[in-house]
Amino acid sequence: MNKLSVVILAAGKGTRMYSDLPKVLHKIAGKPMVKHVIDTAKKLSAAQIHLIYGHGADLLKQHLADEPVNWVFQSEQLGTGHAMQQAVPFFQDDENIVMLYGDVPLISKETLECLISQKPENGIALLTVNLDNPTGYGRVIRENGTVTAIVEQKDANPEQLKITEVNTGVMVSDGASFRKWLARLDNNNAQGEYYMTDVIGLANQDGFKVVAVQAKDLMEVEGVNNRLQLANLERHYQRKQVEKLLLAGVTFADPARFDLRGELTHGKDVEIDINVIIEGTVRLGNNVFIGAGCVLKNCTIADNVEIKPYSVIEDAIVGNNAKIGPFSRLRPGAELSENTHVGNFVEIKKAQIGKGSKVNHLTYIGDAEVGHHCNIGAGVITCNYDGANKFKTLIGDNVFVGSDSQLVAPLTIASGATIGAGTTVTKDVQENELVITRVPQRHISNWQRPKRK
């Protein structure tokens, strides 16, 4: 098998997006379009990924800083052929070169593998598609079934405009052939540009075969020029993801109201209500229920967990049989053991909650360790920040913390301790102690309320 490299054209401005952001950085499923294409190139085990860039160079490099791409600058956007010419110095003669586009994000590894497998020796394999309305696309010209040329819309005659088979722009040939044909391109056309499609005619002139492979899924080769097209591809992508999950046994209250912006793995009997968003890498165990409006990002959820509506979980771990929400927030570093309860308007950050413990109402637990079978009352705050540094709160097992208490870190509360409601704790608490700092209650008889003047 020949070595393979990929060229991704990503230099365009995207005027019709009406945005300062380069077009290829607009997102599908929470990921820049060009990143989808790069990920597909990686799946092909490409030896090199050449990224042709121009407009928005700094933003592109910022967003793709961790990607293994060869940055190839195109100072002027003079057509697809001109873009490919910039990458020619990096081609090896005996490698296959696949040409892709940063604004065609849903092209699949399987489709490209099929295309590559059909490439004739020293020839070209071209990805095409039949459209009911081919307006705007380059028409595929055939003679006796053989592809002889591609004519762009603005250069086509009336008979050619009737053709419904169109060029997707995706093609593969070897490095030596591309180098030879790209050197012979001219811009003698209505646009004054160097068309990559002209290499089809050059290949025929040289007696080399051009094979057309039809894409099975039209949406794989749909490009994005405006936000309507972007939204259509987003919905198509989400439908495909939901179909896979449904067939794998996940129940959705409404498949049209779910967004997957990453990777979801799951056990059996998972149920997901409406308007749930999954981001990053999320792992769900068996018998997990996710209520309406929840957002889960980079988290692991064990078996028999109930996540009630409008809870947000990010970079957290949740143990078996936990109950979360509604309106709970688990921030990075939150770890809930089995049989824990975290209730409404509770925020937990960088803290471990022991098995059987409950934090049910209006509470902030940050930079803390809470032992087993504790009860943290409503309105409790771990005061972990002094304006410059963070400090930790350690709570043992079987601790009861009364409502509206403040735990000023650094602080240790030993097992079995009880903190009375309304207490501000500033010193360590020993085992089985009761701590209370409440102001003494006063009773004033025959109190007269103030009267309005």
UniProtKB/Swiss-Prot annotation:
Identify which residues the record assigns to the active site.
361
Pfam families per UniProt: Hexapep, NTP_transf_3
Q: Name one GO cellular component term.
A: membrane
Q: Name one GO biological process term.
A: peptidoglycan biosynthetic process
Residue ranges, annotated region (N-acetyltransferase): 249-453
Residues recorded as binding UDP-N-acetyl-alpha-D-glucosamine, renumbered to this chain, are: 9-12, 23, 74, 79-80, 101-103, 138, 152, 167, 225, 331, 349, 364, 375
By its UniProt entry, which InterPro entries does this protein fall under?
Bifunctional_GlmU, GlmU-like, GlmU_C_LbH, Hexapep, Hexapep_transf_CS, MobA-like_NTP_Trfase, Nucleotide-diphossugar_trans, Trimer_LpxA-like_sf
Q: What sort of enzyme, by top EC class, is this?
A: transferase
CDD domains named in the record: GT2_GlmU_N_bac (cd02540), LbH_GlmU_C (cd03353)
E.C. no: 2.7.7.23, 2.3.1.157
Instruction: Tell me the SUPFAM superfamilies matching this sequence.
Output: Nucleotide-diphospho-sugar transferases (SSF53448), Trimeric LpxA-like enzymes (SSF51161)
Q: Identify the residues that bind acetyl-CoA.
A: 378, 384-385, 403, 421, 438
Query: Is Acyltransferase a UniProt keyword of this protein?
Result: yes
Q: Which GO terms describe its molecular function?
A: glucosamine-1-phosphate N-acetyltransferase activity; magnesium ion binding; UDP-N-acetylglucosamine diphosphorylase activity
**The entry's keywords:** Acyltransferase, Cell shape, Cell wall biogenesis/degradation, Cytoplasm, Magnesium, Metal-binding, Multifunctional enzyme, Nucleotidyltransferase, Peptidoglycan synthesis, Repeat, Transferase
Q: Which annotated residues bind Mg(2+)?
A: 103, 225
HAMAP family linked: GlmU (MF_01631)
Q: What does the record give as the function of this protein?
A: Catalyzes the last two sequential reactions in the de novo biosynthetic pathway for UDP-N-acetylglucosamine (UDP-GlcNAc). The C-terminal domain catalyzes the transfer of acetyl group from acetyl coenzyme A to glucosamine-1-phosphate (GlcN-1-P) to produce N-acetylglucosamine-1-phosphate (GlcNAc-1-P), which is converted into UDP-GlcNAc by the transfer of uridine 5-monophosphate (from uridine 5-triphosphate), a reaction catalyzed by the N-terminal domain.
Q: Which family does it belong to?
A: In the N-terminal section; belongs to the N-acetylglucosamine-1-phosphate uridyltransferase family. In the C-terminal section; belongs to the transferase hexapeptide repeat family.
Q: What is this protein called?
A: Bifunctional protein GlmU
* Lineage, opening ranks: Bacteria, Pseudomonadati, Pseudomonadota, Gammaproteobacteria, Pasteurellales
Gene name of the record: glmU
